[in-house]
């Protein structure tokens, strides 16, 4: 089996990407998409090219668009360091590390629902969980 990872970004033509994967002999992709709707669209394209799709789900370090929404609606969901500084406001090694706090029941409920929503998409054949750890 020959697989790769791919993030569905606005500047990527997914039809072309899956065509190249098929031509290269890939069997599957761990795909990160911004929304269930994007997964649905991408799964349809992948199927035409014989590519199996596993959802590559970013858990405690949500992607930029999702992170921004959480920061606006639930700033208290982010991890706090020993100095009382939230990763929502203070850099933890790199600017993209804005980790949610897994100790909060609300965060766990949010992540469970996110995975359930993705698992309900016809054609998503597996899940690859990423960023399932505490911030460095």
List each model region and its residues.
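Hydrophobic faces of well-ordered beta-strands that scaffold small-molecule active sites
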Residues: 1-4, 29-31, 53-57, 127-130
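Active-site beta-loop-alpha junctions enriched in small/polar residues
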Residues: 5-9, 34, 58-62, 131-134
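Catalytic domains of carbohydrate-active enzymes, especially glycoside hydrolases
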Residues: 8-38, 121-124
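Aromatic/hydrophobic pocket-lining residues that form the small-molecule binding cavity
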Residues: 14, 39, 107-111
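Conserved, mostly hydrophobic/aromatic
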Residues: 21, 53, 111, 118, ...
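Surface-exposed amphipathic alpha-helices with a cationic face
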Residues: 22, 40-50
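Extracytoplasmic/secreted cell-surface and envelope-processing proteins
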Residues: 37-43, 63-67, 136
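Active-site-adjacent "subsite" loops/lids of carbohydrate-active enzymes
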Residues: 55-121
């Amino acid at each position: 089996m020959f697989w790769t990872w791919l993030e569905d970004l606005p500047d990527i033509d997914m039809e072309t990407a899956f065509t190249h994967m098929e031509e290269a002999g890939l069997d599957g992709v761990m795909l990160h998409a911004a929304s269930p709707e994007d997964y649905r669209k991408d799964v349809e394209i992948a199927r035409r090219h014989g590519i199996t799709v596993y959802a590559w789900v970013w858990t405690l370090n949500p992607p930029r668009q999702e992170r921004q929404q959480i920061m606006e609606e639930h700033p208290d969901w982010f991890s706090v360091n020993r100095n009382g500084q939230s990763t929502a406001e203070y850099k933890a090694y790199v600017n993209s590390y804005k980790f949610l706090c897994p100790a909060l029941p609300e965060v766990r409920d949010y992540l469970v629902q996110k995975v359930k929503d993705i698992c309900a998409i016809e054609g998503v054949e597996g899940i690859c969980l990423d960023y399932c750890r505490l911030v460095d």
